[in-house]
Amino acid sequence: MDWGAYEYHAVSGSWIAKDFRHGSGFEHGLQCIIDPDVVVGDDVRLGHRVHLAPGTRVLDDVEIADDCVTTGISLLGSHVRVRTGSCISKAVIVDDWCFVAAGIMSSHTKNVDHARPQAPKRQLVTRFGYGSVIGSRTNTSAGVSIAPGAIVGYGSHVVTDLEIPNAVYYNDPHPWATLQREIDPDNAYYVEVPESYMPHQFDAELLAKYLPHYRP
């Protein structure tokens, strides 16, 4: 780590990159690390011991609680809430109004050549859809997509796409998340996605820099 790229904030005990850019209303807790090439919007609030890795992009009105990390290029949309101890891994997009509960582990994008140089290079993007709720202690495999308005139950293992929006998923009868029921439009938990809403995407420059082997 090039500590010359950081400034030490003595009051909070945090290391913050000199090129860090943020909007108005930014707040952070104690002992945070914000790496180079991180950009956050307005009214972003970080808890204690939060680590944002290079390539992280955070939009407006986002709360990231204590002991959370990003591990690389990632995008958190507006009005997202990430609760204590969650890991937003490299190549994860969290769309607007998503709630990520405590202790979520999203798997790193695939490019499994760490020990096998001849292995095919392939990088995948994971998506948590608009208004989805990801229950505590959920694990997600690389490259899965969770539909808008989906509710994923506690301790679920998401190994395939959860394709039906406004539906409940959890580990029953298998040890991975499967469809349990759909949510009625008159239910308070039903999420209406605005017709004008466009799911977030990584821009081309970020993809070229951090995910050169990603192919849509």
Predicted regions and their residues:
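Short secondary-structure capping/turn segments at boundaries of alpha-helices and beta-strands
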Residues: 12, 29-31
